[in-house]
Amino acid sequence: MKPMSKIQIYTTNWCPYCNAAKALLDDKGVAYDEIDVTDPQLRMDMIQRAHGRRTVPQIFIGEQHVGGYDDLSALERRGQLDPLLS
């Protein structure tokens, strides 16, 4: 079993914001684990870990809950994403 990446992103395959978040992370050249929440148990795990948030994507860097795509892109615009990723 491969070790978990520092970054986890909870997604569905039909979510445009999930695709945008993955594209931003891909552009940064960072590895991440994608967790498909069409599995009901994984969705419940996401909701619990994200303190009740039910929308996707939900992004975690280490143990820090970043939030969704808007939150991730706001960190990028403010120059605060790269330090979290390093």
Task: Specify the residue positions occupied by each region the protein language model found.
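Short alpha-helical
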Residues: 16, 41, 54, 67
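Thiol-based oxidoreductase modules, predominantly thioredoxin-like and allied folds used
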Residues: 31-43
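A general structural signal for well-ordered alpha-helical segments in protein cores
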Residues: 43, 53-56, 78
